Amino acid sequence: MLEFVEKLTLYPWLLVRKDVTALQDAGFPDPTILHIVLGCAHFNYLNRMADGIGIRFEYQTEIPEVAQRRSDSGSPGPASLDPTVRESESSGLAWIGFQESNNVVAETDGPLNLYCVMSANPAARDLAREWRSYQLKGTTQLEGRLRAQLGLYISGLNHCEYSAYWLNKILKGLSESDSLCERLASGEPPPGLRSREQSLFTHARRLTYEPASTKEEHIQQLRRSGFNDQGILQLTMLCSYFSFENRVALALGVPIERET
């Protein structure tokens, strides 16, 4: 289990069906595996929130800071970023069993399979659905199109084809170009960004790959780019949410819905 959690935390795109099968063979029932995945993904969300806005201990502590594991480029190396690793397992049923819910089917205009695979934990499923909707609603500091672009970019960095599929649909509905969507889905920021938008995509990449490397100077850069603290909080929540969603989809092998 610890090996599974470590991989889900550090390299979620490398998870394959046999990782889940190993948990099942070790005696973990599917609802427990779901609980493990949700817990790990949730703490990845919380870690990014804490690191992204500089939350520190409220009291004196002797706990040492954890040294950062970095490659020479400051991000995961090419081998760990190979998007073809999961290609052979990109179709079929999710890696754990689940029961489809008529309520979910009736009420969902979005990532149905993501919610169905969470059906063993209805409270978490319903909260995830509401939280996703909240994160994609535009605000003064982060309008809806930009939020979807950032979500697709983060999903591209994590090689999460499932989340990328749905974010791509949102952007296509906003008449976004195919070329830009393809670029974002491959983990590349839009070309020719102004400094304001560039600071957003740079920070999103940092929170995706190395959230603990965030420093106050990075927050100051966002402020200089025109974001107030509420906007920075919104950006941090958005990046943290897609860290959660990507990990749930990747860890459970959630398949893309078949269009009829």
What are these regions (language model features)?
Residues 1-260:
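Hydrophobic alpha-helical segments
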